A protein has these predicted regions:
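Short, conserved clusters of charged catalytic residues that mark active-site
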Residues: 26-27, 70, 104
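Generic hydrophobic, amphipathic alpha-helix propensity
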Residues: 71-75
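Metal-dependent de-N-acetylase/amidase catalytic core
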Residues: 1-17, 34, 38, 65-66, ...
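Short beta-to-alpha linker loops that shape the active-site pocket of alpha/beta-hydrolase fold enzymes
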Residues: 48-50, 93, 161
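ATP-dependent adenylation/pyrophosphate-handling site
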Residues: 3, 9-21, 25-66
C-alpha cells in the first residue's frame, strides 16, 4: 500500500525504536522530515550505543566512552535538525545484544512505551542481518503484545540500508510505503551528515 500525504492514521504520538544512533535516520529520516510540521509528538529510543564494537577489548575504556558520547551527540544534533528533542539513550553494548536476556531489552522498550503512550511504533525488521537490529525487533514485538498497551495501534518495520538488504534469500520486503518529496529526502541526507564518523567512500554503503 502507498500512503501519500495523509498521515493522520499514525496518530499524534509516534515512537521510533532503534538499536543504535543513526539507525533512526537511515530507517526513518525521510518520514521524520515529512512529519516535522505535522501536529504530532515524536519520541526516539536508542537501545544501544554504536561505537564500542569497533574497538578491541584491549583498547582504553576512556576512548570508547568518548566515542559513545560523540555518537550520542551526533544523534542529538541530527534529531534537533528534524525538530525532535530529548531522545532516550540506553547504551547497551554494541554488537552484544545477544548477551542480554531478551526480556530485559523488552522491559526497556515496554517502560518507554508506557511512559510515552505512542499510537504508532517504527522499529527494525526481522530480516535484518545485524543481530542487534534483529533483537531490537524481537524485543519490540515482545513489548507490544496485546495486553494493557492498547494505545499502540500501528507497528511498522523499517529498512536500514547496509544490513537489511544484505541477507541472501530473505531480504527486506516492505508491504507499506509512505511517499517522500525531494525536500524530505534532502532533509534526511542532511540529518545523516551530522554522523561524521559514519560517512565513508564507496563501496561503503553510507
Amino acid at each position: 500500500k502507498l500512503e501519500a500525504d495523509n498521515l493522520n492514521f499514525l496518530g499524534t504520538k509516534i515512537m521510533i525504536i532503534a538499536a543504535h544512533p543513526d539507525d533512526d535516520i537511515l530507517g526513518c529520516g525521510g518520514l521524520l522530515a515529512k512529519l516535522k510540521n505535522k501536529p504530532c509528538e515524536i519520541k526516539v529510543i536508542f537501545i544501544g550505543e554504536g561505537s564500542s564494537c569497533r574497538y578491541n577489548d584491549k583498547d582504553k575504556k576512556d576512548i570508547i566512552e568518548k566515542e559513545i558520547i560523540k555518537r550520542n551527540n551526533y544523534a542529538n544534533s541530527a534529531l534537533k535538525y528534524l525538530g525532535i528533542n530529548k531522545p532516550s539513550f540506553h547504551n547497551l553494548k554494541c554488537g552484544c545484544f545477544d548477551t542480554y536476556p531478551l526480556i530485559n531489552i523488552g522491559k526497556i522498550i515496554e517502560n518507554e512505551i508506557v511512559s510515552f503512550k505512542p499510537q504508532t511504533i517504527f522499529t527494525h525488521s526481522e530480516t535484518d542481518l545485524n543481530n542487534d537490529h534483529k533483537i531490537t525487533y524481537q524485543s519490540t514485538l515482545q513489548a507490544t503484545r496485546p495486553a494493557a498497551l492498547n494505545y499502540v495501534k500501528n507497528l511498522f518495520s523499517y529498512e536500514v540500508i547496509s544490513s537489511s538488504e544484505w541477507n541472501f534469500g530473505n531480504s527486506f520486503k516492505p508491504n507499506y510505503f509512505i511517499s517522500l518529496s525531494k525536500k524530505d529526502l534532502d532533509k534526511k541526507i542532511r540529518a545523516f551528515e551530522y554522523y561524521l564518523s559514519e560517512i565513508k567512500n564507496y563501496p561503503y554503503a553510507r
